[in-house]
Amino acid sequence: MKSLSFLNHEFEAFPSPELALTDPNGLLAIGGDLRPDRLLTAYYHGIFPWFNAEDPILWWSPDPRAIFIPGQVNISTSLRKYLKKQPWRFTINHAFTDVMAGCAQPRRKQAGTWITHEIQMAYRELHHNGHAHSIEVWQGERLIGGLYGLAIGQVFCGESMFHRETNASKAAMAVLQQHLIKMNFKLIDAQVMNPHLESLGAKALKRADFIQLLTQFRDDAVNPAAWIPSEVFLEL
């Protein structure tokens, strides 16, 4: 039976994602906090927080789930040609806080953002502890795009991306894919399907199939050098 759970500030297990509501799609639990151990437990089980500043913390596990397979992100011929002409630089874990701030800026026709100060503080702590990571796109010394997310074993859980120049967020996605392939990651969790993700090649999986893949790869060892801050060259 579908049901909504209410969490308190004592650490407790999340309910099974199978119990998430169908309307709104994937809402599983309300409350709790954003402590690192709770967040990591959530992602480990295919659950993530998503809420507005005026709301309590809401925990989700939607069905279907948007995912990418590293190597199958769609980098079109026209995008490759465009990126080859740009004098951009790409880095990993050089400016996590700034990337989160860029992602938190309200989008066009949006009044606010779900990446609240509370969310930013929580994920900055995860970054400090080696769990959350960023990709940066630079034009000179100016940050023009990027993305961030969490690594759970050989699964990268993407959270958000932004751009200040055309195609800069797509460039960040191309860099992420290249890096994950080199580090033998198996899955990118993109959470909720939208037209932009679909245009990049995201696939919609039944939640049960996603959880099966997550369970398969979440405990796999990762190269210790995978997330050392570095500058990378985008191979097109």
Swiss-Prot record:
Enzyme class, first EC level, given as a word: transferase
GO molecular function: leucyl-tRNA--protein transferase activity
InterPro entries with a match to the protein in the record: Acyl_CoA_acyltransferase, Leu/Phe-tRNA_Trfase, Leu/Phe-tRNA_Trfase_C, Leu/Phe-tRNA_Trfase_N
Places the protein is found: Cytoplasm
S-S bridge residues: none
GO cellular component: cytoplasm
UniProt keyword terms in alphabetical order: Acyltransferase, Cytoplasm, Transferase
Domain of life from the UniProt record: Bacteria
Enzyme Commission number(s) of this protein: 2.3.2.6
Catalytic activity entry: N-terminal L-lysyl-[protein] + L-leucyl-tRNA(Leu) = N-terminal L-leucyl-L-lysyl-[protein] + tRNA(Leu) + H(+); N-terminal L-arginyl-[protein] + L-leucyl-tRNA(Leu) = N-terminal L-leucyl-L-arginyl-[protein] + tRNA(Leu) + H(+); L-phenylalanyl-tRNA(Phe) + an N-terminal L-alpha-aminoacyl-[protein] = an N-terminal L-phenylalanyl-L-alpha-aminoacyl-[protein] + tRNA(Phe)
Record GO biological process: protein catabolic process
Pfam families noted in UniProt: Leu_Phe_trans (PF03588)
Role this protein plays: Functions in the N-end rule pathway of protein degradation where it conjugates Leu, Phe and, less efficiently, Met from aminoacyl-tRNAs to the N-termini of proteins containing an N-terminal arginine or lysine.
Family: Belongs to the L/F-transferase family.
Record-linked PANTHER family: LEUCYL/PHENYLALANYL-TRNA--PROTEIN TRANSFERASE, LEUCYL_PHENYLALANYL-TRNA--PROTEIN TRANSFERASE
Name of the featured protein: Leucyl/phenylalanyl-tRNA--protein transferase
Upper taxonomic lineage: Bacteria, Pseudomonadati, Pseudomonadota, Gammaproteobacteria, Alteromonadales
